[in-house]
Amino acid sequence: MKSEIFDAQLFNALFLCWQNCIHVGLPMKKTWESNQIDWQDITRFLIFIDEAHKIINTNKLEAAEQLLKFEREARKYFGGLIYASQSIRDFVPEGSSQDSINVIKTLFELTQYKFIMRQDSNALDTLSTIFHNQLTETELSHIPRLGKGECILSIKGDENIEFKVDVSEADLAIFQGGA
C-alpha cells in the first residue's frame, strides 16, 4: 500500500477512535460529575496499538501529533492508550531530526506508565534520549540484561519498579507462543 494511502487511512482510523472516545466518554463524564454513577461502573475507552513503531515514528509525525492530542485529552473522557513495540529505536530511526525526536519524546513523556523490557545495548542512547531523567544510569545499564518476563515499570512522577511478569501455562496456551 502506498504511504499516502496508509497515512490517510490511519488519520481516519485515529479520528474515528477519538470520536468514539468522546461519544462514550462525554456522557460518562457528565454522569460521574453529577454523582449518578459509581467509579467501577464507568465505561472506559482504550486503544491498544501493537507494533506501534509502524504508526508512531519520526517519519509519521502527523500520526504522532494526532496521538499527542489524544493523550492530552482522553483521560478527561476515561480514555487511554497503550503502545507496544520491541525496540525504542524503531520509533526514532537513525538520522531523525531533533524536532521530530522531540515529538516522540513528548509522546512518551505524557505516557503515565512505561513497561520497558529487554532492549539491545545499542538502544541505550535512544532510551536515554527519549526517557531523559526518567531512568537512572543503573536502570538504563540493566535493561539489556533483563531476562524473560522482567521489566522496569516507569511511573510518571513517582518511581520506577523492576519486576518479573509470570505467565501461566493456560495463558501461554491462549497465545500459542505469540501467534
Give the label of every model feature segment:
Residues 3-141:
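Conserved P-loop NTPase motor cores
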Residues 1-2, 9-21, 135, 141-179:
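Conserved P-loop NTPase motor module
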